[in-house]
């Protein structure tokens, strides 16, 4: 009996010593800014064993600080190397080696659960490691996975996704190569309202998406439209060749660096590319590319590109490109382009382009363009262009080097030609046209289709025969004037322009006319203030008469035979100085239409 007891005690002691080993020994290490080699020497001394390692592999000269009281050797080494070194006990030594990752392969076939037919372009992925692949035309897939726990293999969850099919999950044992197949069922068809089921795969349908993304990458985005992950950073050479591999299109990053181009789910930080960035979802806060940026969601922050920016939702912030900007749901902020800006949503802010701005919905702010601006809805602000401006409803100012066009103008139109259907503001130009007017038109020719159109034939104290065309409305109308005296020895000709305002039974007008007296060198200028009482004498016919005050300026008194020598004629003028004289006269005549 005594011998049996001694045997059991001896066996337990051996078992305890074996279980403890060198990694299980307890040590205390408190060292500040010491080389790793010194820390290992201290552990060796306390544990009564030896390390075996290559100095370069463990970075023996690196300076570290360690605080470990009554910890196992393994715990101290884990703290020291953070999983980068593997430990192996051999006799009385503890080998330190590089920690090589373990990989295993999973393969199989994916078939249609209803027909049994193989499914082509189905996505198979692991959501933690962000590793994915797609089935070939026989429905076969092969996936290389990393073993997460080297001491105890853990099961891995794979997901099979395909557009119009239900997602299917496969549990895979870790640690060894294996085959596993699955049949997935089509999604149940249901009737819904109008929804954008593939709202985050739209970038693949753009021209740029079709050119720079492969068909497999576009299929992947369709299959995984419900799966997205967040990661702190990524880098890539081209779409699919980077940190997140084939799943890069489903990852939202905080920092994204693309050597040539990248394809990501979105951004919540900074993205820089040597050529292009393509993001399926929203982008915040800064995006830079030498060529172009394409965003499937909203853009908030700063977006700069050398050629083109395209946002398939809205922009809030600053957007600039060397060639063009396009936004589907408008912008709020500043939009600058070397050639053109296009927005199909409501806009608020400044839009400036070297050639043209085209906005399809309401705009609040300013539009500046070298050639033209177009707002297909309401413009609440200013349109300034070198050639033309177009707006449906203008509540602000249109300023163009040639022509302004609007359906309704409640502000100001300034250009060579201004045209509007309903005028409730002011037009200033050489030619103004309005279908109907409750505003003011100031120009050489101002036509209101449903306003004044009158032909005047009348006599004045200066010229017996005068013609004038009056157009506009009661608030303000314009006059184009011509007059003549054909009497031998008293010839004279005049031409000019004027504006006037009509009241119930009378009108007030100011005109400016040039008076030709036989020589263009002696031509004078008349400024005339006149008022007239008018009376209707028939349908579309009125008689008018009234006084006039005329100021005449001429810096040359040379006389030409056959032309007037005395102004106004029947009586003399009152001279104010050598160049300026005035007189009081009249005008009387008829108006038609």
Task: Set out the residue ranges of the language-model regions.
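Short acidic/polar beta-strand-loop edge motifs in secreted extracellular
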Residues: 20-42, 53-77, 98-100
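A short, solvent-exposed loop/turn motif at the edges and junctions
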Residues: 81-86, 150-172, 186-188
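Extracellular beta-sheet/turn segments enriched in Thr/Pro/Gly and aliphatic residues
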Residues: 92-101, 174-199
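Structural motif
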Residues: 109-120
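Short, acidic Ser/Thr/Gly-rich low-complexity loop/linker segments typical of extracellular
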Residues: 129-144
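Residues on the lipid-exposed face of transmembrane beta-strands in outer-membrane beta-barrel proteins
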Residues: 257-259, 416, 428-430, 444, ...
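Transmembrane beta-strands of outer-membrane beta-barrel pores
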Residues: 261-263, 276-278, 292-294, 308-310, ...
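Predominantly the C-terminal beta-signal and adjacent terminal strand-loop region
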Residues: 435-438, 474-476, 529-593
């Amino acid at each position: 009996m005594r011998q049996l007891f001694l045997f059991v005690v001896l066996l337990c002691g051996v078992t305890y010593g074996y279980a403890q080993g060198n990694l299980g020994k307890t040590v205390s290490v408190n060292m500040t800014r010491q080389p790793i080699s010194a820390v290992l020497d201290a552990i060796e001394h306390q544990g009564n064993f030896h390390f075996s390692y290559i100095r370069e592999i463990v970075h023996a000269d690196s300076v570290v600080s360690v605080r470990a009281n009554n910890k196992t050797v393994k715990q101290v080494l884990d703290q020291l190397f953070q999983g980068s070194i593997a430990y192996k006990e051999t006799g009385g030594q503890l080998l330190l080696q590089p920690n090589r990752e373990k990989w295993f392969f999973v393969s199989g076939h994916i078939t249609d659960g209803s027909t049994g037919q193989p499914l082509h372009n189905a996505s198979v992925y692991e959501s933690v490691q962000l590793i994915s692949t797609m089935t070939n035309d026989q429905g076969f897939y092969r996936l290389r996975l990393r073993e997460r726990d080297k001491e105890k293999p853990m099961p891995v969850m794979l997901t099979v996704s395909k557009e119009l099919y239900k997602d299917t999950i496969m549990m895979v044992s870790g640690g060894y190569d294996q085959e596993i197949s699955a049949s997935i069922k089509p999604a149940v068809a249901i009737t819904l309202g109008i929804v954008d089921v593939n709202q985050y795969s739209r970038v693949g349908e753009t021209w740029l998406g079709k050119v720079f993304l492969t068909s497999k990458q576009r299929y992947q985005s369709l299959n995984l439209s419900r799966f997205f992950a967040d990661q702190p950073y990524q880098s890539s050479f081209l779409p699919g060749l980077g940190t997140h591999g084939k799943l890069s299109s489903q990852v939202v990053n905080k920092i994204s660096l693309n050597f040539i181009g990248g394809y990501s789910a979105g951004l919540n930080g900074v993205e820089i590319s040597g050529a292009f960035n393509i993001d399926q979802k929203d982008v915040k806060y800064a995006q830079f590319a030498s060529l172009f940026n394409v965003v499937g969601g909203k853009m908030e922050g700063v977006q700069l590109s050398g050629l083109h920016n395209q946002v398939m939702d809205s922009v809030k912030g600053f957007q600039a490109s060397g060639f063009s900007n396009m936004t589907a749901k408008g912008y709020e902020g500043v939009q600058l382009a070397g050639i053109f800006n296009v927005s199909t949503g409501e806009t608020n802010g400044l839009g400036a382009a070297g050639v043209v701005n085209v906005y399809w919905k309401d705009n609040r702010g300013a539009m500046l363009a070298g050639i033209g601006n177009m707002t297909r809805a309401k413009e609440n602000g200013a349109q300034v262009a070198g050639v033309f401006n177009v707006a449906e409803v203008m509540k602000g100012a249109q300023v163009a080097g040639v022509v302004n066009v609007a359906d309704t103008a409640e502000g100001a139109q300034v250009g060579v030609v201004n045209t509007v259907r309903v005028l409730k503001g002011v037009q200033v130009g050489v030619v103004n046209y309005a279908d109907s007017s409750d505003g003011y038109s100031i120009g050489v020719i101002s036509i209101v289709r449903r306003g004044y159109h009158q032909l005047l034939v009348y006599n004045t104290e200066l010229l017996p025969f005068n013609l004038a065309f009056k157009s506009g409305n009661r608030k303000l109308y314009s006059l184009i004037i011509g007059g003549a005296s054909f009497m031998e020895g008293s010839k004279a000709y005049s031409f000019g322009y004027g504006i006037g305002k009509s009241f119930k039974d009378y009108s007030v007008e100011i005109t400016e006319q040039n008076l030709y007296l036989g020589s263009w060198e002696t031509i004078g200028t008349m400024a005339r203030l006149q008022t007239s009482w008018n009376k209707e004498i028939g349908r579309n016919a009125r008689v008018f008469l009234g006084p006039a005050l005329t100021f005449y300026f001429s810096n040359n008194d040379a006389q030409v035979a056959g032309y007037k020598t005395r102004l106004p004629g029947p009586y003399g003028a009152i001279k104010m100085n050598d160049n300026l004289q005035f007189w009081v006269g009249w005008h009387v005549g008829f108006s038609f239409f």
